[in-house]
Amino acid sequence: MARAAFLFKTVGFGGLQNVPINDELSSHLLRAGNSPWQLTQFLDWISLGRGLATSALVPTAGSRYYQMSCLLSGTLQIPFRPNHRWGDIRFLRLVWSAPTLDGLVVAPPQVLAQPALQAQADRVYDCDDYPFLARDPRFKHRVYQQLSAVTLLNLTGFGPISYVRVDEDMWSGDVNQLLMNYFGHTFAEIAYTLCQASANRPWEHDGTYARMTQIILSLFWLSYVGVIHQQNTYRTFYFQCNRRGDAAEVWILSCSLNHSAQIRPGNRSLFVMPTSPDWNMDVNLILSSTLTGCLCSGSQLPLIDNNSVPAVSRNIHGWTGRAGNQLHGFQVRRMVTEFCDRLRRDGVMTQAQQNQIEALADQTQQFKRDKLEAWAREDDQYNQANPNSTMFRTKPFTNAQWGRGNTGATSAAIAALI
């Protein structure tokens, strides 16, 4: 059904006393323009390059995603305070330029002279509680597209959440022809196009763009775990990965007339998220969650079960609740094995090819782990030396998260969708 509740959740602090962002990071995020709602800003923070290296301040695509979450989590607590006073207090050195939240600017001297806002962790706000958003549905949609993506990252201590749905009824109308227009394009290219379409105009619930996005997500995830491929397609479509296990996988929408999987009737869906920290370097996983955010901005998706999220994320209207859908976690490296096992069983891959892919995946994971852990150590050292200017460049994680995620069960749950 169409979305009626526009709540969003802010970031946790990861053990710090305030939002994990400082003046230097916030200035870097806004260097291209002072409005965090600009489409160029949005497409910038969901993905950078191929996700491997960017800059010292923004080392990965996941860094940009997390840092924008921190910036919005802090600055939006200004207008969402009681009485909606938007310009009388600053977050860091920033204030909103107008009550319509058009942009962020350096606070005037009289505000800079006053103490900054002490933001709170893990807060839930309703867009309709702020009059300027409540009165402008179009701008609220544009804002909520990004706040939905932020919420999908902030609901847990792991990676961003994606929605996967399989329903034959989604293929009605001109969806099949539109899919052919994307033939040969990468998942990232398709995701960018759909994000632009969502920002330009709100999607009708279960309209063409909403159905197209859900089909693209289902094709990606069914391909990601190896359920569909060139010998077992979903209505002739699948995503072909040029080099599975590589540090920068590219998934290309492809077609094959060899064999189509038999799809059971009915509507089946689930939520999935990476639990290992290397999601930070996987643009495809980030874009998948971003597309889910586009869906959330216009449609009410099924609730995520309370037992799948921490206590601070339970019973958020429109997001989590009792008897909701289970949130399935997986370890990125282990999912490569699930992918290879399926293709080998289906006769698409040899054991030697699987061994080669898995060896590459091991090297890739070690490379990513070394980088992410080095950045985390540097951030910890910086925060100890600068207690009044703390920040995290990537979402905090623990060593245990490298081994977490019931990957086999998650892979089986995705496979069971068809």
UniProtKB/Swiss-Prot annotation:
Coiled coil: none
Recorded superkingdom: Viruses
Transmembrane parts of this sequence: none
Keyword annotations from UniProtKB, A to Z: Capsid protein, Inner capsid protein, Virion
Function: Inner capsid (core) component.
Chief site of localization: virion
Assembly description: Interacts with protein mu-NS; in viral inclusions.
Protein name: Inner capsid protein sigma-2
Family according to the record: Belongs to the orthoreovirus sigma-1 protein family.
Annotated GO CC locations: viral inner capsid
Subcellular location: Virion
Keyword tRNA processing carried by entry: no
Naturally occurring in which organism (per UniProt): Reovirus type 1 (strain Lang) (T1L)
Gene transcribed to yield this protein: S2
The keyword Hydrolase appears for this protein: no
